[in-house]
Amino acid sequence: MTTDTGYAQVNRLEMYYEIHGAGEPLVVLPGAYMTVDLMGDLVPALAKSRRVIAVEFQGHGHTADIDRPFSYGQFADDTAALLGQAGIEQADVYGYSLGGGVALQLGLRHPARVRRLVIASASYSSDGLYPEVVGGMENITPEMFDGTPWRDAFDRTAPDPSAFPTLVEKLKQLDLTPFDWPVEELAAPALILIGDSDGTRLEHAVDMFRRLGGGVFGDLAAQLPASQLAILPGTTHVGMLDRAGWISGMVTMFLGT
């Protein structure tokens, strides 16, 4: 059940947020083209034991666009500013897809704000994606979203529904901009979640895990790595949204609640 909704004025942006449940704070960062409700059953599942603060990025859903390009770093700064306004000094963070990239940037740019990270279906560098994913990004058009849940959600919630082509173009530019982040510099432990048929290459997810201290023979190690990796069977990129039961259980165990 949604207990609160509102807008935070951050960095010239009126950023929409929802608060569900009670307990220790857990920030949920949705994927590209997504509103909070498109996260499906995950937010209610996590809100059973946590105070979930779910946001919508610039140009997404209830959050109107402004004259500013999209970037992972800027979205992370917006989220950090929202937490500051809410009086939340530190929180756990769950990010899916685009939100996973923002979560990584939040951990790198604002380490004091982040206790633990959950990175779902995201990469730390642009070469982590399958080539066909990049090809799809290059050829994407607004018309491809006609009749989809993403377009329907935008039309239902956006202050200016006619701005959808602008959203597509800005996300296209973001997606096609190369990046490579030093994930080994993350201070927060991370749970990496990926589908076995996701858009991010499995080798990339394993490499991320290794960069965070994973990939050891645990039975002979002094202790298990602080970060963890889970590969979800029979799961695609979009299909991660249908795995709320699996994911919420793993997230709860990792966060210790």
Residue ranges and their predicted role:
Residues M1-E14:
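N-terminal cap/lid segment of alpha/beta-hydrolase-fold proteins
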Residues L13-A64:
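Conserved HGGG/HGGXW glycine-rich cap/lid loop of the alpha/beta-hydrolase fold
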Residues A32, A91, G95-G100:
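Conserved alpha/beta-hydrolase "nucleophile elbow" surrounding the catalytic nucleophile
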Residues P44, I194-T235, L241-W246:
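Conserved loop-alpha-helix segment in the C-terminal half of the alpha/beta-hydrolase fold
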Residues A47, I53-Y94, L232:
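Active-site loop/oxyanion-hole signature of alpha/beta-hydrolase fold enzymes
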Residues L167-V183:
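Active-site nucleophile elbow and catalytic-triad environment of alpha/beta-hydrolase enzymes
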